[in-house]
Amino acid sequence: MKLTLEDISKNSEQIFYNLRWNGEIACPVCGSVHVYNKDAGKLHICADCQTRFSDTSGTIFHSTKLSLSKWLYAIYLFLTSTRGISSYSLARYIHVSQSTAWTMLMRIRTCLGQDIKFDSTDVVAIDEMYLGANWAYKPGFKKYRQAGSPPAFYNLNEKDRKSWYKKKFYELAAEDKMAILGMVSLGGPRRARISLIYINTPERKDFVKRAVLSRCASIMKPFFVDTPMTIVTDQSGLYKFLEQELDHNNQPRFNHQICRHDQNKYASADGYSSNRLEAAFSHIRRSWRGVYQFWTRTYNQLYLNEFCFRYNNNLSDKSVTLKRLQDFFSRVDPRAAVHFA
């Protein structure tokens, strides 16, 4: 069953009621279904713990002054936009201010947590990307090129000069970019899934190790599975720990496949490639530049969760199923702190 814009405009309250309770009202505190109504059904009282709650209690719609039709319309646009929707565009569509639209979108994103676990049947590609301004457009780059060239620089050809510029300036500008760790499944019985994590610490090696092991090594292999989990990376030193991890039989836990990008080789010796993850990174850059123009480090993980939700749920079609819409009515308090791995 699909939900249309006409349904949202006419029966928003009934749609919300049906999706929130699914035919049976339950207390958000103790979970009891022994509930009686008050004020013509607008207020519910739990018979066990005496908690008073409404249909919007414990959701992102709690204490809102906007109509439910605008909220449902905002979620509809959020889900059906291929690369996301900016707060300015949403404000024009539902006739609210830009700050109100931004708050609505951020509340929606708080429901999009990542709970991705890869098992031994998956082939996982891991890579990192750095989101930020192009190194050639950074302030002071031309001055650095003029003053920072070594004497041997003038003996290099044009191609090697550009490589030297790029390498040296990346070292200076790396701290200004947002480092993102990406993991995507390349094969297996299930559909491809992706997990994106914002690296918000200078200790990147330790952070990457904890993040990878929490999603790939936390699920122990069955005893009858002798083949290690295959992980595909580039030649970066961030992933050397994969060759040192052992399982309960003191055997390598991972089959580490390396794509030598520095040698212009984009597939490992066994034919594995990380191009699917590179394609996902290109979509993130297009959203960052074309839709949102910019977002701060503070909310970087929320935007990454949004991208993962689109990728993992295949929201390319222009329709919203009731099951997808019901995910936003989970008991999430937007005023609580949101923590990420």
PLM features: residue spans?
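Residue-level recognition of single "structural anchor" positions
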Residues: M1-A341
